[in-house]
């Protein structure tokens, strides 16, 4: 609305604000009279000019000051206000006072006589430090200067830049990252593929790109992921494993066997995704990477020459066990196994019903493109779940198998369905059978579920004995070992309390496989070998 600021009215007519004389009581009982008075005041030309002036100041972003505009308005209005209450007994108090008040003066106007807009002071604005950074928090000044100083020292002898084989010292000493990430980081900076990383290019990526201020997990995550992706795929880890195989002294013996190098890299990646990718999507998020222990394992493997001492993910012995167990089951060596192959696992330890559930792809969809066949990756997930039932990924894997109707709980009927085959197998080998009613009581005593008639996944995760439940239901050999309290297993647990079930299994299996390989080498050896005395292993 356009406010007319013309000068047609030079003098304020006090009669415009005249109302009949009212007593204070009458005014209190009739509040609409005060509203009418305010409406009349708004209609005055002087008021219009004041409002227009304030609007113009606001539009022009200039400080709002109404002292000039309202001085004459105050005077004119002040002379008119007493006539409103001509017949009242006692004049009401006014914030502007009366003409006779010593506070009222043309020459000097106190703050209380000015516009209410002026009297309300704006609170001082407090400077809130920036807490969101679209590209990450920039590094502190001292950290930035320290990093640049180190970079200058490294590049002082390489004015034209560093080649890939010269870049490893930057990765390890400046970036504080595992050395086998060097080639991936190099290519991340050298986007044009020149084969050289200059000082300015490194500063732009590592310092100006705020990589310096990130935690190690975020740094590795951003180095490995593809542009535009918010997750890590299996292929993103392949260059890292390739460099590890090329540079790590503990894997040097594999350099002449590229096939086994490839299998080792695949197995490590499968183990990483089995434990880290808890959502099962095949894509590792930054949150999952931070929650897992992969970063610690990567740092450890970079410092340890003996790869087998890094039992998380990278142990060659663990790879050897997984690969050899798969190879034993894969009779035709087409790198695929079927139900009949898997039923032989662990000396026919598993029941047909649980194998059917696995091949129904209930716990996990197969990556194999051949129907009814399990690939090496699928087997890696299976063996990790079977031999480490105390881990959460394993509990989730087997819980899906036992939960026949997929309602999120395991009922006594579902447990009985799987235990029936166990009971039949015990009868076949003349083993004294254990009735299901007794087993059910034992299971509920071990788990102590929140509800009496069913078991949830959370109930299993809260109990340290959960793995035994699945052994009771579908693994006869482990069930018998649990019932007899195998002294060998008990002694092994006491000797290495920090090891997981998988670690102990891999340790035993590697010894067994090594002994079998030694025997095979002896049997295929020369006549000279047969002449040497052999000590009995027992």
Curated annotation (Swiss-Prot):
GO molecular function, one term: calcium ion binding
Disruption outcome: No visible phenotype.
SUPFAM superfamilies for this protein: EF-hand
UniProt feature, compositional bias: Acidic residues: 529-538
UniProt key word ATP-binding: no
Stretches assigned to the EF-hand domain: 177-212, 264-299, 390-425
Keyword entries, A-Z: Calcium, Metal-binding, Repeat
One Pfam match: EF-hand_7
The UniProt record lists the keyword Metal-binding: yes
Disulfide bond sites: none
Polar residues: compositionally biased ranges: 107-117
Compositional bias (Low complexity): 88-104
Residues reported in the UniProt entry to bind Ca(2+): 403, 405, 407, 414
Region annotation (Disordered) ranges: 88-120, 519-538
GO cellular component: mitochondrion
Subunit structure: PP2A consists of a common heterodimeric core enzyme, composed of a 36 kDa catalytic subunit (subunit C) and a 65 kDa constant regulatory subunit (PR65 or subunit A), that associates with a variety of regulatory subunits. Proteins that associate with the core dimer include three families of regulatory subunits B (the R2/B/PR55/B55, R3/B''/PR72/PR130/PR59 and R5/B'/B56 families) and cell signaling molecules. Interacts with HMGR1L and HMGR1S (via N-terminus), but not with HMG2. Interacts with PP2AA1.
Stated role: Regulatory subunit of type 2A protein phosphatase. Not involved in HMGR regulation in seedlings grown in standard medium, but negatively regulates root growth in response to salt.
This protein's name: Serine/threonine protein phosphatase 2A regulatory subunit B''alpha
Lineage: Eukaryota, Viridiplantae, Streptophyta, Embryophyta, Tracheophyta
The gene coding this protein: B''ALPHA
């Amino acid at each position: 609305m356009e406010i007319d600021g013309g000068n047609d009215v030079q003098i304020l007519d006090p009669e415009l604000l005249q109302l009949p004389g009212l007593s204070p009581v009458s005014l209190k009982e009739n509040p609409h009279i005060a509203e009418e008075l305010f409406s009349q005041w708004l209609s005055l030309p002087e008021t219009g000019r004041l409002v227009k002036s304030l609007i113009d100041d606001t539009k022009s972003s200039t400080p709002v000051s109404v002292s000039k505009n309202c001085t004459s308005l105050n005077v004119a209005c002040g002379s008119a206000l007493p006539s409103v209450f001509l017949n009242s007994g006692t004049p009401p108090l006014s914030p502007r006072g009366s003409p006779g008040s010593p506070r009222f003066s043309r020459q000097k106007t106190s703050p209380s006589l000015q516009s209410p807009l002026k009297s309300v002071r704006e609170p001082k604005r407090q400077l809130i430090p920036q807490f969101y950074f679209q590209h990450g928090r920039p590094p502190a000044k001292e950290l930035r200067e320290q990093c640049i100083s180190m970079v200058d020292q490294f590049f002082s002898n390489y004015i034209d830049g560093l080649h890939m084989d010269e870049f490893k010292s930057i990765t390890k000493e400046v970036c504080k990252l595992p050395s086998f990430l060097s080639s991936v980081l190099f290519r991340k900076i050298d986007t044009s593929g020149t084969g050289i990383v200059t000082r300015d290019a490194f500063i732009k990526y590592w310092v100006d790109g705020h990589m310096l201020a990130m935690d190690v997990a975020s740094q590795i995550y951003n180095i490995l992921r593809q542009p535009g992706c918010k997750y890590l795929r299996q292929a993103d880890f392949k260059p890292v494993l390739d460099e590890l195989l090329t540079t790590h002294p503990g894997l040097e013996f594999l350099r002449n066997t590229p096939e086994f190098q490839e299998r080792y890299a695949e197995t490590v990646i499968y183990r990483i995704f089995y434990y880290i990718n808890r959502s099962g999507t095949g894509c590792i998020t930054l949150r999952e990477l931070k929650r897992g222990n992969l970063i610690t394992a990567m740092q450890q493997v970079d410092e340890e020459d003996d790869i087998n001492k890094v039992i998380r993910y990278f142990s060659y012995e663990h790879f050897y066990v997984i690969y050899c167990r798969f190879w034993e089951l894969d009779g035709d060596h087409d790198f695929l196994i079927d139900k009949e192959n898997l039923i032989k696992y662990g000396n026919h330890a598993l029941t047909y019903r649980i194998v059917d559930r696995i091949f129904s792809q209930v716990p996990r969809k197969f990556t194999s493109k051949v129907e009814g066949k399990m690939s090496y990756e699928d087997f890696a997930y299976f063996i990790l779940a079977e031999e480490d039932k105390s881990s959460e990924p394993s509990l989730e894997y087997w819980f899906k198998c036992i939960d026949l109707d997929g309602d999120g709980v395991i009922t006594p009927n579902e447990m009985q369905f799987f235990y029936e085959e166990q009971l039949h197998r015990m009868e076949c080998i003349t083993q004294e059978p254990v009735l299901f009613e007794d087993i059910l009581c034992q299971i509920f005593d071990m788990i102590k579920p929140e509800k009496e008639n069913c078991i949830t996944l959370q109930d299993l995760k809260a109990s340290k004995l959960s793995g035994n439940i699945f052994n009771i239901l579908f693994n006869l050999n482990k069930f018998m070992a649990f019932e007899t309290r195998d002294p060998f297993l008990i002694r092994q647990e006491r000797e290495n309390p920090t090891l997981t079930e998988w670690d102990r299994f891999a340790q035993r299996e590697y010894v067994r496989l090594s002994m079998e390989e030694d025997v095979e080498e002896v049997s295929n050896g020369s006549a000279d070998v047969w002449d040497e005395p052999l000590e009995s292993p027992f």
